[in-house]
Amino acid sequence: MRFIDEAVVTVKAGDGGNGIASFRREKYVPRGGPDGGDGGKGGDVYVIAEDNTNTLVDYRYTRRHDAMRAENGHSRNCSGKGSDDLFLPVPIGTTIVDTETDEVLGDLIEIGQTLLIAKGGDGGLGNTHFKSSTNQAPRKATSGFEGELKVLKFELKVVADVGLIGLPNAGKSTFIRQVSAARPKVADYPFTTLVPNLGVVDIGRHRSFVMADIPGLIEGASEGAGLGIRFLKHVARTRRLLHLVDIKPIDGSDPVENARIILNELDRFSPELANLPQILVLNKIDQVPEEELNELCTHIVAELGWTGIVFRTATLTGEGVDAIKYHLMNEIEREREREIEDPIFAEAQKARFERLEAEVRLNTEAQREAYRAARKAAREGTDLSDDDFDGSDDDDDGVEVIYAP
């Protein structure tokens, strides 16, 4: 299944039915008076979060969704039947944005959560409502109101507690294979991972958290190089960032500079994102002789000026992986408990995530506009640099997204 994380959808709520003008016609009841019923209410349009889908691909091909129009009123003061509400299933983690106002209508982050996105029109009034002492036989009835028409953007961000970041081939996919049942593709070439992969890290005794493997970043990603920041937005919902650094790159590059590239790209793309708690993971320690390992790791940490938590791992063999799992689980549990016990902290966390998502959305759109402008200028013969990021609808890769329980 193709992984599609954005779609622009037009939704139309149902129109209300018309009220009617009719009169009571019954034997032995002369001048029976008005008995026109009201029109029914048009169906609303909702989105509902479901856990059996993890892509918006259906909305890439079917872009218009209309609720049915309600019935008109009937005689004998019978109202028309209202039309059924329309429910559009979306993956958990979908944000609904009004394209005209850029207003975020809501986030769907729980199974079964619903959100009203277009309200159906009310039914018109039958002529019974217009009877008065001076007008015993009104012939007036009103039409039903139109349902709301909206053009909305569905944005999917994976819901994960921990986001894996790093250069291509830093060992992120191997790491998530070690700690969960997810089986992303692993190979010895860059950009093996083309879409986010989710894995549930099960510690046991009902203790677990979700980890997201994000496609590798390269220098200039914040400006569109490589895969750009197309998938960087998926770490906007995470509580922690796990920064994997290959301490012995096969291309002979400097691991310190490689780490700085990621830190700089994060900061350039979103300072709020760069301020998320980060853990530095010095990976592939099995590729360095034991007598050189401690000196190399100490050098990397010192050169980066890193004052946070540092782990050493060999993801291929699993060495050091369990320590990271348990550390993350303990930290996440403490944070969850504090959010429950401390309303002020919970509100601050919510505000931080809202700021982060707003900043990520703004920067993503800005980059897309810059890309479109560059592409237009290139077609017109202006010498502007192009890049590999494509914000259009035809840049999707036919790849699979893996969501393993």
Curated annotation (Swiss-Prot):
Main location: cytoplasm
Domain of life: Bacteria
PROSITE patterns xref list: G_OBG, GTP1_OBG, OBG
GO biological process, any: ribosome biogenesis
The OBG-type G domain, residue ranges: 160-333
Binding site for Mg(2+): 173, 193
Biased composition (Acidic residues): 383-399
Group of enzyme by EC: hydrolase
Protein name in UniProt: GTPase Obg
Species: Psychrobacter arcticus (strain DSM 17307 / VKM B-2377 / 273-4)
Gene of this entry: obg
